[in-house]
Curated annotation (Swiss-Prot):
Pfam families in alphabetical order: Aconitase_C
Annotated family: Belongs to the LeuD family. LeuD type 1 subfamily.
Catalytic reaction list: (2R,3S)-3-isopropylmalate = (2S)-2-isopropylmalate
Entry protein name: 3-isopropylmalate dehydratase small subunit
Catalytic activity, EC: 4.2.1.33
Quaternary structure annotation from Swiss-Prot or TrEMBL: Heterodimer of LeuC and LeuD.
Domain of life assignment: Bacteria
Lineage: Bacteria, Pseudomonadati, Pseudomonadota, Alphaproteobacteria, Hyphomicrobiales
Enzyme class label: lyase
Species the sequence originates in: Rhizobium leguminosarum bv. trifolii (strain WSM2304)
One GO cellular component term noted in the UniProt record for this chain: 3-isopropylmalate dehydratase complex
GO molecular function, one term: 3-isopropylmalate dehydratase activity
Task performed by this protein: Catalyzes the isomerization between 2-isopropylmalate and 3-isopropylmalate, via the formation of 2-isopropylmaleate.
Keyword terms of this UniProt record: Amino-acid biosynthesis, Branched-chain amino acid biosynthesis, Leucine biosynthesis, Lyase
């Protein structure tokens, strides 16, 4: 998993509340267990017309936001059924940070396991960031995970809180496998001691 230390990029505004996982990645895209290629299905029902052509009015289809790395979204983002394909689709599109006032718990935790930083801010700060994100190609935000700070295009900054363990994992690019490997020496030492003291179980 790639480390997340500091991210600077275009922020796309999505002022919609209760965006559920079916909106993020429709069920038609859940047949694969591959993490790549799902970016085309991100918000598919909003991004495309029934004939498969792009909906020019959807934010991620607008030229200024096609390469967005940050999504500023309405309250309760990621609600609905549990599907890890949702963060996979965001990541494959290129989005590594989602900012909202709240997230569904399962989606929130799945983000960290896949290298995406979900940030919770107050409604007042979300309104400010949504306004910043509405500036088109000038909607550049910098998310500094080391200092827990978001800097807007006008230079103003917003602080955010994050569980220290989750912060450590993102800063060091550690998913569940990475965390296990980080304890590799301790695990090997235990296995050797356990085998020596319980030879019948070896």
């Amino acid at each position: 998993m790639d480390k997340f230390v500091k991210l600077t990029g275009v922020a796309a505004p999505l002022p919609v509340v209760n965006v559920d996982t079916d909106m993020i990645i429709p069920k038609d895209y859940l047949k694969t267990i591959k993490r790549t290629g799902l970016g085309t299905g991100l918000f598919a029902e909003a991004r495309y017309h029934e004939d498969g052509s792009e909906n020019a009015d959807f934010v991620l289809n607008k030229p200024a936001y096609r390469d967005a790395k940050i999504l500023v979204a309405g309250d309760n983002f990621g609600c609905g059924s549990s599907r890890e394909h949702a963060p996979w689709a965001l990541l494959d599109f290129g989005i590594r940070c989602v900012i909202s006032t709240s997230f569904a718990d399962i989606f929130y935790n799945n983000c960290f396991k896949n290298g995406i930083l979900p940030i919770k801010v107050s409604q007042e700060n979300l309104d400010k960031l949504m306004d910043d994100a509405s500036r088109g190609s000038n909607a550049i935000l910098t998310v500094d995970l080391e200092n827990l700070e978001i800097t807007g295009p006008d230079g103003g900054s917003i602080k955010f809180d994050l569980d220290e363990f989750k912060r450590h994992c993102l800063l060091n690019g550690l998913d569940d496998i990475g965390l296990t490997l980080e304890k590799g020496k301790a695990i090997d030492s235990f296995e050797k001691k356990n085998a020596a003291s319980h030879p019948w179980a070896a």
